[in-house]
Amino acid sequence: MIWYTIVNFKMKTSLQIENSGVSAVWKEKVMNALDLAQEIIDGRRITREDDLSFFLTCDLKELCEGADRIRAHFIGEKVDLCSIINGRSGRCPEDCKYCAQSAHNHTNCEVYDFLPEETIVEACKMNESEGVDRFSIVTAGRALNGEEFEKAVHAFETMHRECRIDLCASMGFLNEEQLHRLHEAGVNSYHHNIETSRRNFPNICTTHTYDQKIETLKKVKAEGMCACSGGIIGMGETWEDRLDMAVSLAELGIDSIPINALMPIKGTPLENLPQLTEDEILRTIAFFRYINPLANIRLAAGRALLTNDGEIAFRSGASASITGNMLTTAACATIRSDREMLKSMNRDVTPDYWKEA
């Protein structure tokens, strides 16, 4: 499969581009970002064969403006808001270097087993009353199995019966049968981040592989669920790694792409990494939009690094956001303030279930 190819990110010279038959607009960077945005609106798609270094050298303001035009054309003004509940916390056996919930790291992460169903359903109903589009149960661990998985299925069945909000799950490496059972219980989206590029993945985690991530996402797509997958930037990766991640997600046909900016957590191996600048985050969001024009580009952790909790990102290609409580990083924006901010930008924050009422 094409997404298994290990990419050589030695960027093409203009002569190599000319000889390879790649569109001449890439030669010597004669195209600006706004022209490229129009080509994407007209049907062009960015691939690994293109000179991806363009996105690193073009004018940031033009890149963001072009990304916003692409967003407006393909996604429109609707902003998809999702909220999550940490259904099971801590003691994760995986060694992800960024994560407070890994048992390999030394953090003050709260530890508890799967939450009572009434706690989850109450949170779901609260989010529905506030106008959030979808609600997700997220659990720590390699995969949710056994009695706890059965509890999750029952909780989703209850929420599907009593609520109209869309339902999502993030429960690790589930098999086909488990994904099917969640789907039957009312879950229509499944989240499973690839985290970074194939090249960089072993620097971030060694207890599972990039290929296992890809296989899980293929199962999600085969089940007919929406696939939500993105990653974290600021973990010591290169710009080429970020571009690779964006292209890999496009090749997989991912529907929703959360972009997290690392908020270093004390007690993790990445605790001393510098925080990203706003310009770095915006450039990343923007080129993810160019490369994934049909996907929801979703703001996730790290919004505190952006002006006004990310308002500028919604003018740079973002079309969705996690809102409210955000697991183990500080949540700087509440649901109501997010909705007010987006309404002030003339964005549509009315969930479908309110429109249907």
Residue ranges and their predicted role:
Residues 64-105, 112-136:
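N-terminal pre-triad scaffold of radical SAM enzymes
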Residues 77-84, 91-93, 97-106, 153-160, ...:
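Mobile, glycine- and charge-enriched loop segments
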Residues 104-123, 127-220, 225-230, 255-260:
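Core AdoMet radical
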Residues 141-145, 216-240, 259-274, 295-306:
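Conserved strand-turn element in the central/C-terminal portion of the radical SAM core barrel
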Residues 149-156, 185-191, 239-255, 309-324:
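Short, electropositive alpha-helical surface patch
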Residues 170-175, 232-246:
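Active-site glycine- and acidic-residue-rich loops that bind
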